[in-house]
Design a protein with these regions (language model features):
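Positively charged, low-complexity/disordered segments
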Residues: 184-186, 191-199
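"…together with the soluble PPM/PP2C metallo-phosphatase catalytic core" -> "…together
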Residues: 2-179, 183, 187
Length: 199
């Protein structure tokens, strides 16, 4: 457990300061190019730079790369690739008007690194029945969970800060559960959750 603390602290610090430091530069660069939209959550017609996720994805990817240097396991590599691909899909969706089919289908393909690297467990643990191995069901869940999560976050983002607040609360709870778990690989995955919620 102790060997996880230093990498976690380094990843969290790098994620926080990279996002904190890059955001003003990203905002200025976008405003200079007039890439702005009306803030729909304010009464006044305030123009804001978009997309702001450019600095966030840098922070997430840097923190995950640091974790991967310390713990070169397929789960972290799969998260690095899946997160990056999902960001590209979101960026395309923001910049161009695509059909309603594009985002869910493209996000489903983003699950490819998880499947190809085998970064999932096909055993389901039920409180009453114990562990059950259902590989086909789990493969389907992996493919569907990425577009479901992406669209869920979009649907709850009704006010500034709601999506980030929700994901922070959910990630923090998952981090605690993962760190308590006796499995060492699961604890390492928990560290990656912690980086997201504390950055």
């Amino acid at each position: 457990m102790e060997q996880l603390i230093i990498p976690a602290i380094i990843a969290i610090v790098v994620a926080f300061f990279s996002v904190y430091g890059l955001t003003p530069f990203v905002i200025r660069a976008l405003e200079k190019r007039n890439i702005t939209v009306v803030d729909a959550n304010k009464k006044e017609k305030t123009m804001i730079a978009r997309p702001g996720g450019l600095s966030i994805i840098v922070g997430i990817e840097l923190s995950l790369i640091i974790l991967y240097v310390f713990f070169p396991i397929s789960e972290i590599l799969a998260v690095i690739l899946t997160t990056f691909f999902a960001f590209i899909v979101g960026l395309i969706d923001d910049r161009k008007t695509m059909g309603g089919w594009f985002k869910p289908l493209a996000l489903a393909f983003c699950a490819a690194p998880i499947l190809l690297l085998g970064a999932y467990d096909s055993n389901l643990d039920f409180p009453l029945f114990g562990s059950v191995k259902i590989p086909l069901l789990y493969t389907a869940l992996v493919v569907f969970m990425i577009p479901i999560m992406g669209n869920t976050i979009n649907s709850i983002d009704v006010l500034n800060g709601v999506a980030s607040g929700f994901t922070t609360i959910a990630s923090f709870a998952l981090s605690i559960l993962s760190l308590i778990h006796i499995s060492e690989p699961t604890r390492r995955r928990g560290i990656s959750y912690a980086v997201f919620c504390l950055k």
